[in-house]
Amino acid sequence: MKTLINLIGEQPIPNLLPPLYLKSQKNILLYTDTTEKAANRIKRILSDCELKKIDPYDLTMAINGIKSVVKADEETIFNITGGTKIMSVAAYEVAKENKSKFVYLQSEGRRSLLFTYSPEASDYRKPSKEEIPELVNCELYLKAHLPDYYTTGYSMEPNSNRLTSGGEFEEAICDSLDKQKFEFLSGIRPKGVGNQIEIDLIIRLKGTNNVGIAEIKLGDKMEEGPKKGLDQLVMAAEREYLGTYTTRFLITQSNLSKQIKELASAHHICIIDDLQYEFRNKTIKSTAVTKLNDRIKEKLS
C-alpha cells in the first residue's frame, strides 16, 4: 500500500495535487490548530484519509508525532510542501531515517512541478522533476477552498426573473469566452458568509490546474461598480477563502481611471477594460472578444 503523509498548510492545493497525481491509497493529513479546517476540506476529496494533529513548532514532538503514523509494512512517501518549517524538518528527518521518498510541489509561475527526492538518487541530492497534468476542475477547486457554496448564475432584479443590466453584461462576457479553452462557473456564493463575498465568475484554463476568479462590472462615472469589484476580489483571495494561488480579474466595459488601475496593480489584480459592449443587442465586439480571451489565457498560462 502506498501511503502519502501530507503536511497541511493554510493553502489546500499543495496538499491536493500530489496525492491526486501519485494515486496514494492512503493519505495521512498532519494538521495544527490553524490548519484543521483545511485538513477537513481535503479529507472530503481524497479517499482513505486519516487526520493527525502534531506540534508545529517543537521539533522533537513533531518528529515523534510523525513517527507514530509511519508503518513498516507500507510504502511511505512524505509530501513536505505545506506545514511549518519545523514540520518540514521533522518530516525530512523521519523520511531519511526510514529511507523513504519525499516530494515537494512548486506552484509558482503557473506550472505545477513535483520534485521527488529519494535515497537512491545521491542520497536525496538529485531530485526528479515532473509537471503535474490537469487534475482539478472549478468545482473541485471550490470544494478544496470553501466549506460549501452554491451558484446563482447572472445578477437578477429583486423578486424577478429578469437580468439586471449588469447581469446582461455578465452573460455577454460568458458567451464570449472560448469554451474550447476555458471551463467556468458563474455566480458563486460561498455559504456561511452572508453577502460578504459574491464571485461573478470562476474560470480555469483547460489542460492546466490554473484557476482565476473575476468580477464583471459595467462601470459608471464614479466608478463605484469597479471599486466594489476590487473589494470583492481582495476579500475573496484571503487565506480563509480562495487564497493566494487564485488569479484575479476585474472585467469591465468602461475605460477605467489611472487611480483604479494603480489600486488593482497594488493588489495584483488584472484589469480587462474598455470591452466595447453594445447595450442594444447585448453583445461584445469581436475585437474585444479576442482581447478578453487572450488576456485571460495569458494570465492563466
Feature names for model-found ranges:
Residues 1-76, 89-301:
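Long, low-complexity, Lys/Arg-enriched
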Residues 77-81:
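Periplasmic-binding protein-like
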